[in-house]
Amino acid sequence: MAKKSLIQREKKRQKLEQKYHSIRRSSKKEISKVPSLSDKWEIYGKLQSLPRNSAPTRLHRRCFLTGRPRANYRDFGLSGHILREMVHACLLPGATRSSW
């Protein structure tokens, strides 16, 4: 189980990313449209003035049960360890163990 503070920090980053997503996207579109370099520098300054944690690259996918940051499966939102336990307990419909 991950520390609760780390899970809360990740939730805070998600909220910031959602809040500033439209501003960040519109300013990036402006950069491609503006021909002069000085105007581009001004827009870059606006981008840099946004909070650091509002960047989507700062987000990290975590297991929603344990908060584990590694070995996450996107389809289920679970870490590999928990996914395996739930499949063995038949808690995930349609998931089967592979055998060959």
From Swiss-Prot:
Q: Does the keyword Plastid apply?
A: yes
| Domain of life per record | Eukaryota
Spell out the GO cellular component terms annotated for this protein, sorted alphabetically and separated by semicolons.
chloroplast; small ribosomal subunit
Region feature (Disordered):
1-31
* Keyword Plastid part of the UniProt annotation: yes
Q: One biological process GO term for this chain?
A: translation
Q: Which Gene3D superfamilies match?
A: 1.10.287.1480
Chief subcellular location:
plastid
Keyword list (alphabetical) reads: Chloroplast, Plastid, Ribonucleoprotein, Ribosomal protein, RNA-binding, rRNA-binding
GO molecular function terms noted in the UniProt entry:
rRNA binding; structural constituent of ribosome
Compartments where located: Plastid, Chloroplast
| Residue ranges crossing the lipid bilayer per the database entry | none
The entry sums up its family as follows: Belongs to the universal ribosomal protein uS14 family.
Function summary? Binds 16S rRNA, required for the assembly of 30S particles.
NCBIfam families per the UniProt record, alphabetical: PRK08881.1 (NF006477)
Instruction: Provide the assembly information.
Output: Part of the 30S ribosomal subunit.
> What is the official name of this protein in its record?
Small ribosomal subunit protein uS14c
User: Coding gene?
Assistant: rps14
